[in-house]
Amino acid sequence: MDRVLVASYPINHLIRPHSFRIDYCWSTCFTSRLNSGKERQKLSSRWRWRSMASDSTDSSSSSSFAPSVESDPSDKTSASFCIIEGPETVQDFAKMELQEIQENIRSHRNKIFLHMEEVRRLRIQQRIKNAELGISKEERENELPNFPSFIPFLPPLSSENLKLYYVTCYSLIAGIILFGGLLAPTLELKLGLGGTSYEDFIRSVHLPMQLSQVDPIVASFSGGAVGVISALMVVEVNNVKQQEHKRCKYCLGTGYLACARCSNTGALVLIEPVSTLNGEHQPLSLPKTERCQNCSGSGKVMCPTCLCTGMAMASEHDPRIDPFD
């Protein structure tokens, strides 16, 4: 199909019978070749992918149209080609040729690094704006999602507020034990309620006899509540540990490290030699500073381990990274 475009009529308007006869014979032979199903499928597949790749080519390539169609360079990879548009729309790419697969892999990997570079520059600009506005409190950036808490009325789970979960859990357990062991028996004695079903057991384990007045319903409620809260706390701790394992060990999930050139200050002190004239003592001038060129004044540089993602072992083969999760 691409040779039909190349073997078009000449640019001048003089149609010579000789050239017209050659073009007619060549097109007839080419049409006869299309009778085989295998050749037609191959050419149609090549034309489909070439038509998609032609949308992303520059306008400068129009001057050399004939050699650009014949050649198949890697810079003609489709810019709008998307294999996975969402969890429900996944295109069938099993029929693609080897060259097309390699070109699309190269193109998509380049797009990934371009997007990561955009995120890096946006974060640098964000830090610069915060420094210009005088925002001294620097919150730690965390790209990993927060796990919702199983305990009601508590904030999302993270490693920073894990102590709050411990305090809440122990407070609830202590309150339930005090209610079931001391408060409930006292109220039952004053109200004339309760029973002696646990009296023998309390006496055998040498506990205060006041505990024998506990109602079975209260005891069941207290024991069940303590077990449920303990199980929820175990789940919360496991979620925190899983979240910490997914973070990068070097940048702790922030995606950036402190700049070693400016010592995380964002500015460099210019050291100038001091010269004296006639042995006179003159006061030294104040040192001058300039913006660090390594970190652009932000005090942070990209983490080379996670490539600004904040995730440990950021790789396209990492089984923990699930785009549909």
UniProtKB/Swiss-Prot annotation:
> Which residues does the annotated region (CR-type-like) include?
226-317
Asked if Phosphoprotein is a keyword of the record, the answer is no
The UniProt entry annotates CXXCXGXG motif repeats at: 248-255, 292-299
Instruction: Enumerate the residue ranges of region (Disordered).
Output: 53-77
Q: Which GO terms describe its biological process?
A: positive regulation of carotenoid biosynthetic process
Q: Which residues cross the membrane?
A: 164-184, 217-237
Task: Spell out the GO cellular component terms annotated for this protein, sorted alphabetically and separated by semicolons.
Answer: chloroplast; chloroplast membrane
Q: Where in the cell is it found?
A: Plastid, Chloroplast membrane
Per the record, the major location class is plastid
> Residue range of the transit peptide?
1-54
Q: Which residues are in coiled coils?
A: none
User: What ranges cover the CXXCXXXG motif repeats?
Assistant: 259-266, 303-310
Composition bias type Low complexity, residue spans: 53-71
**Keywords in UniProt for this one?**
Chloroplast, Membrane, Plastid, Repeat, Transit peptide, Transmembrane, Transmembrane helix
Summary of the function given for this chain in its UniProt record: Triggers accumulation of carotenoids, mainly beta-carotene, in fruit flesh.
Give additional notes from the record.
Answer: Its sequence is related to the DnaJ family but lacks the J domain. The CR-type-like region is similar to CR-type zinc-fingers.
Q: Of which family is this protein a member? A: Belongs to the orange-like family.
Name of this protein: Protein ORANGE-ORANGE, chloroplastic
In its UniProt entry, the species of origin is given as: Cucumis melo
Q: Which gene encodes it?
A: OR
